[in-house]
């Protein structure tokens, strides 16, 4: 869609991970103090994964699993911010510019509101975006399903790219 002479592309990303003992809880590159962490091949930062997938979708470049296969040892325990930076290079290489990000983390526990400012700062730096173009919110699942029972977390992200 062209608006004001710019072609715009919207991407949607989603991620879901189980919470387990013995792992750190990383969201947006920030470690959140909690007794459980997210299970995954990398650091399992589902917020960064959802944003990464949204970027790939908007650029029509596939999905995060295609670029960083979960069975590939080079991505074992890697920071998801590294994956995000590699995807940003691909997106920018196609002549696309990130305009804004809106994301919502769905988690019953821990309460994320106190950590949102640090998460936004971390992601703004990684994405090269001013804070007024990066929204991160948190909500619960009202006690329903695996997320509501505190067994998992989910994240939805939307990005807008401009050509």
From Swiss-Prot:
Keyword DNA-binding carried by entry: no
PANTHER family: 2-C-METHYL-D-ERYTHRITOL 2,4-CYCLODIPHOSPHATE SYNTHASE, CHLOROPLASTIC
Residues holding 4-CDP-2-C-methyl-D-erythritol 2-phosphate: 15-17, 41-42, 63-65, 139-142
Reactions accelerated catalytically: 4-CDP-2-C-methyl-D-erythritol 2-phosphate = 2-C-methyl-D-erythritol 2,4-cyclic diphosphate + CMP
Matches recorded under InterPro entries: MECDP_synthase, MECDP_synthase_CS, MECDP_synthase_sf
E.C. no: 4.6.1.12
Gene3D superfamilies: 2-C-methyl-D-erythritol 2,4-cyclodiphosphate synthase (3.30.1330.50)
Biological process according to GO: isopentenyl diphosphate biosynthetic process, methylerythritol 4-phosphate pathway; terpenoid biosynthetic process
Record: residues binding a divalent metal cation: 15, 17, 49
Recorded metabolic or biological pathway in which this protein acts: Isoprenoid biosynthesis; isopentenyl diphosphate biosynthesis via DXP pathway; isopentenyl diphosphate from 1-deoxy-D-xylulose 5-phosphate: step 4/6
Site (Transition state stabilizer): 41, 140
Subunit description: Homotrimer.
Cofactor details (free text): Binds 1 divalent metal cation per subunit.
Record family assignment: Belongs to the IspF family.
Cofactors named for this entry: a divalent metal cation
Function according to Swiss-Prot or TrEMBL: Involved in the biosynthesis of isopentenyl diphosphate (IPP) and dimethylallyl diphosphate (DMAPP), two major building blocks of isoprenoid compounds. Catalyzes the conversion of 4-diphosphocytidyl-2-C-methyl-D-erythritol 2-phosphate (CDP-ME2P) to 2-C-methyl-D-erythritol 2,4-cyclodiphosphate (ME-CPP) with a corresponding release of cytidine 5-monophosphate (CMP).
Protein name according to UniProt: 2-C-methyl-D-erythritol 2,4-cyclodiphosphate synthase
Residue ranges of the TM segments: none
Name of encoding gene: ispF
């Amino acid at each position: 869609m062209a608006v004001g002479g710019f072609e715009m592309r919207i991407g949607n990303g989603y991620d879901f991970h189980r919470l387990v003992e013995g792992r750190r809880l990383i969201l947006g590159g920030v470690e959140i103090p909690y007794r459980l962490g997210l299970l995954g091949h990398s650091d399992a930062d589902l917020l960064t994964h959802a944003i990464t997938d949204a970027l790939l979708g908007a650029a029509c470049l596939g999905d995060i699993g295609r670029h960083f296969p979960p069975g590939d040892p080079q991505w074992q325990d890697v920071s998801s911010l590294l994956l995000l930076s590699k995807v940003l290079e691909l997106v920018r290489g196609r002549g696309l510019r990130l305009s804004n990000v809106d994301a919502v983390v769905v988690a019953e526990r821990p309460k994320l509101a106190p950590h949102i400012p640090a998460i936004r700062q971390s992601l703004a730096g990684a994405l090269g975006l001013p804070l007024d173009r990066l929204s991160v919110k948190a909500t619960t699942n009202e006690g329903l399903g695996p997320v509501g029972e505190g067994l998992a977390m989910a994240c939805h992200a939307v990005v807008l790219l401009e050509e």
